[in-house]
Swiss-Prot record:
This is Large ribosomal subunit protein uL6. InterPro entries: Ribosomal_uL6-like, Ribosomal_uL6-like_a/b-dom_sf, Ribosomal_uL6_a/b-dom, Ribosomal_uL6_bac-type, Ribosomal_uL6_CS. One of its GO terms (molecular function) is structural constituent of ribosome. GO terms for cellular component: cytosolic large ribosomal subunit. PANTHER family: 60S/50S RIBOSOMAL PROTEIN L6/L9 (PTHR11655), LARGE RIBOSOMAL SUBUNIT PROTEIN UL6M (PTHR11655:SF14). This protein binds to the 23S rRNA, and is important in its secondary structure. It is located near the subunit interface in the base of the L7/L12 stalk, and near the tRNA binding site of the peptidyltransferase center. The gene is rplF. Part of the 50S ribosomal subunit. It comes from the Bacteria. Gene3D superfamilies: Ribosomal protein L6, alpha-beta domain. Keywords: Ribonucleoprotein, Ribosomal protein, RNA-binding, rRNA-binding. Belongs to the universal ribosomal protein uL6 family. SUPFAM superfamilies: Ribosomal protein L6 (SSF56053).
Amino acid sequence: MSRIGKQPVPVPAGVDVNIDGQNISVKGSKGTLELTVSEPISVSRNDDGAIVVTRPDDERRNRSLHGLSRTLIANLVTGVTQGYTTKMEIFGVGYRVVAKGSNLEFALGYSHPVLIEAPEGITFAVETPTKFSISGIDKQKVGQISANIRRLRRPDPYKGKGIRYEGEQIRRKVGKTGK
């Protein structure tokens, strides 16, 4: 058995879970999320109201889908109750971010400003010109937008300039020495 897959997903009060075959819909105070589970995996509710994920056999593919499906369902429940937030920092002279409505405008040393539009369900918050956060209920969307923004100006291993996650340690390299 998968150590993660066999654990039931607790459903807190105020969260409504609707299971229709392979489709799962979770509704909470922050919104609604839906997920379609892969075919051999089955999802049901137990006596305490928790969500239980089961697999038909111990085939390799089914074992891997078992833990994955359970974690994705747990992410849905967490998303509609607490939501997800990623905090990011900008390092570098002249590098900054400004909120333009619901979008972000970056000055990253290019000859033009870079505009990032907020997709549906994602909100941006700028704390200082070098610190901002990305929030939403869908963990995958929040992580993907964060990765896309980081990709605009990856942290430089020599000087440490660029966009990074808050608390991320950049592996620094020593520059070449002159004679």
